[in-house]
Amino acid sequence: MGLVLSVTDKDFSELLQDFYDVMKQEKQEEAAMLADIIDTMKKDIGIEEVLLKADLLTIRYHVMLGELLTAGYLLDQFEAGGHFLSQQNEYFYQYFKGQVHFKNKRWNEALRYYEHAELYISEDEEKTDFYYKLAHAYYRAGIPVLSVLNANKAMRYATSYKQHYHLAKCKLLLGLNHLEIRNFEQAESLLYEALDCQHNTDETSLDLASMAHHNLGLLYFVQQKFEKAVDYFDQAVHATPCSHYLKSLYYLTESLFRVNHHSEAMKYFQIGFTRSKKEQDMDYQWAFAMLHKQFVDCDNFEAVWAEGIAYYEAIDDRYSVHHYSLCMADYYTLKGEEEKANYYYRLAVW
């Protein structure tokens, strides 16, 4: 005999699907309204599978908001329940746990849970979001070949289901992968295509456009075309919304220093350093402090950079350790201090 659903159960299931759909598009205001309605309706739902799905989607909601402590706590509670999970709920559990690890910059752990989740995925329409996030995790883990493979897979599903937001995100990610392997022409083409995808004026599309501007800035920054980089980072910083504000602000500041626009660079340095302290973002507090010592307070460069590298080493931020250690190694090589240069070269490949 099939499961008999009440009108309330049917309405609630449809509401959960709407909730998940808006979260996949990062529409925070709509998700917040649906979260309140779901919380109110839950008490009238009698089917455990549906309630478990609601609990899992609540975890996903806190991941979207960046409330990782809450998401982790709810995940621990969910695991303690020892529930028997349907195929879809097993997929959500593995997938969302992977997302918690990803947001905490544990790329390999994220990949492990994403690969488990792939075994339970059943709907083709869901595969766009899944393969995009899998591709993003491979990119962060420094495996561009697998990132490109999965981003192309996600893009095929996005095209098939007319998921324009994800199509633009895939182009952005593919652009970054080509930038990573120094295929600048292809990277530029993909990033402009991603920018051209954004014709709407909703907040999600505007934020995606600002991400495209940031990545174009990064493309020119890496090629040391700093004047062009300034133009794109400036557009990213002044976009509303801008989910990557501190990152764009940091690169804008460094680009301005490099083209000798000192007073403007100092203006953005003050904004960035103050903002990072207000938000208690230690990663960017150190990044801005090290930038200041590199271009302004050069007498304290060595000491502050050594402390900064030690900080990034302590939090296992391998990308930052590699980047700053390589800079220090080159610096000491030019000074003829071979022992210190060798130390930082070794640290760069740690």
Language-model-detected regions and their locations in the chain:
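Flexible inter-repeat linkers and adjacent short helices
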Residues: 1-94, 109, 269, 273, ...
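Alpha-solenoid helical repeat architecture
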Residues: 7-11, 46-51, 85-92, 123-132, ...
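Long, mid-chain structured domain cores
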Residues: 49, 56-149, 153-154
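Residue at a conserved register position within TPR or TPR-like alpha-solenoid repeats
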Residues: 22, 62, 94, 101, ...
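Loop-centered beta-sheet repeat module
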Residues: 148, 152-219
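Amphipathic alpha-helical segments of tetratricopeptide repeats
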Residues: 36-43, 75-83, 111-120, 152-163, ...
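Structural motif corresponding to the intra-repeat A-B loop/turn of tetratricopeptide repeats
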Residues: 25, 65, 104, 141, ...
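C-terminal structural cap/anchor segments
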Residues: 257-294
